[in-house]
Each structure stands twice: as C-alpha cells, then as structure tokens.
Amino acid sequence: MAIQLRVFYLVPLLLASYVQTTPRLEKMKMDCYKDVKGTIYNYEALSLNGKERIPFKQYAGKHVLFVNVATYCGLTIQYPELNALQDDLKQFGLVILGFPCNQFGKQEPGDNTEILPGLKYVRPGKGFLPNFQLFAKGDVNGEKEQEIFTFLKRSCPHPSETVVTSKHTFWEPIKVHDIRWNFEKFLVGPNGVPVMRWFHQAPVSTVKSDILAYLNQFKTI
C-alpha cells in the first residue's frame, strides 16, 4: 500500500516543494475584530470518515485552533508540530481541528479515505497520524467554501495585505479576507468567538507563544 501511495502521489509531492511566498516581510498574526457577531457554535462540519456531522458547540469552554491542512505541501512538516502543540496545551483546554483542502497548489488531491494513509506512509510518513480531529475535505475560499470559514474570515482581518493572484490557487471570487495558503490558523476563545489569526508562514513555535500569552488572562498556566 505504501508503494502504491508513493507512485500515485508523485506529482503532488513535486508540488509540495512550492510554498506561497511574498516578496516583503508580512505580519505573522492579527487580532480579530472586537464586534464579532455570532459564534462557532452556530456551525458544524462533517468528520473525515463521513459518518457524522460534528457540531462545534461540543467544544464550548475550549480554546479551539482551526487549521486548513494539506498532505503534500511544503508546510506539511507542521503536522508533527501541531501534534506536539496539542499534547503540550491540551491541559490548558486547547483543541486543534484540521480541515483538509485542495485549493492551494492542488496539494490535497486524494479523497477522504486517502488522507490518513497519505499522512502515515508518504508525508510526513514513518507511521505518522494526527492526534487531533480531522474533518472531511472541503473548500475554505470561494463559492463553495464551508460556512465555518466564511464566519472565521469575516471575523478576522488577514495578516497580509497582499491579495491572492497566484496560478497555484483555485477558487473564485477572490476576496481580501481569503485564506492565502495551507496551514493558516484561527484561534477561537472559550466563548466561541474568534480571537486571532496567523499567516501560513508563522512558525508553530510562534503560534504556541502567542497562545500561551493569550492563556495568561485565564490564569490556567
């Protein structure tokens, strides 16, 4: 099975060396708007195995990190780092949720049943499995974007002022608050309201430091 996966995904692996970059220094993080209307508890998403719709209200009281992920991206190295982040901050109420998406460089080409084997045998490989919830593959931008991402993007300005025009992106219409690439992140507070948003190039170590600083106000660390 591992050999078959390696052959089938040769082209996506070649594309994985491409990570969207910008010619100038970008902000890594932006705080979300203070007048956000609504919460994530109004939404739900389909689990990766397609067997259940998971309502986000089940995460009430938790600090939730939403991440759009891809298996064959140069940033897929963040997967093990996200596992470590989940392990380190779970005791403080952090929950990570991953949303596979194929809109950036076509770097999540498989169907839902192929995503976990791709992670386990190809990239990162070596038996890797995420320790956080993954949801069914879907769009995060454009006409068919998942409703939860419409809400998250509306709630938080993007750290980058550069509008997406890359030939490696696949959606319309393009909007200023759109996610720019794989592994962007949104943190939602225990009341279900978005708190901050990170650029895809922000190191997970930076994300962790920002979350720890945020958690200080709750006196949980």
Swiss-Prot record:
GO BP annotations, alphabetical order: cellular response to oxidative stress
Tissue expression pattern: Epididymis.
Cleaved signal peptide residues: 1-21
Cellular compartments per GO CC: extracellular space; sperm plasma membrane
Catalytic activity: 2 glutathione + H2O2 = glutathione disulfide + 2 H2O
Top-level EC class: oxidoreductase
Record's keyword terms, sorted: Oxidoreductase, Peroxidase, Secreted, Signal
Entry GO MF terms: glutathione peroxidase activity
Active-site residue numbers: 73
Name of the protein in its database record: Epididymal secretory glutathione peroxidase
Source organism per UniProt: Rattus norvegicus (Rat)
Originating gene: Gpx5
